[in-house]
Amino acid sequence: TVTGAWQHEGGGAFHNNGAIYRWDKTLIEGLDVLDPTTRMLDMSRIGRVLTGERSELGDGPPVTALFIQNQNPVQVAPEQRLVKAGFARDDLFACVHEQFMTATARMADVVLPATMFLEHDDLYQGGGHQYIQLGPKLIEPPGECRSNHDVVSALARRVGARHAGFDM
């Protein structure tokens, strides 16, 4: 972003300094129920994943459904030609939970309205510092907007999953 490349397709950055914290996220991330056999796919290689490159699929079948929050891969992921081709597949179902009609949301089959940071309680790990901050809800969300936590918890319950973190 120093060069202003974020303004151009494929010029975004993936960044997280969360590893500096010793925060037990077992409850909020469901770490106690993770299945170690679940394949992990590299979001920075989403174009190759969605176009079915075998080396990127982790010995699993092609991806046929996506649920996307807090990302805009159609705009910022590398290898834009592959990303757009992957999202354009007829056999791919994409649900995007988003605040704005981003490039990724425009390619989704379903777009769910998301809250903004002032519309739900949250805790924040620092970006560029080492503090944890409380972000209290200050205003009501408009219309049918829901927080990431509310949507994920509701979806999990709908498919029969149970976890104490869903009730937070």
Stretches found by the model and what they are:
Residues 2-106, 115-123:
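Extended redox/cofactor-interaction regions of prokaryotic respiratory oxidoreductases
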Residues 118-141, 152, 156:
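Glycine/threonine-rich phosphate-binding loop and adjacent beta-strand/alpha-helix elements that clamp
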Residues 1-8, 116, 137, 157-164:
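Generic secondary-structure signature for well-ordered alpha-helical cores
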Residues 109:
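Catalytic, metal-anchored helix/loop core of enzyme active sites in primary metabolism
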Residues 21, 124, 131, 149, ...:
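Sequence-level detector for tyrosine residue identity
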Residues 67, 138-168:
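N-terminal leader/propeptide and maturation segments of large enzyme subunits in energy/redox metabolism
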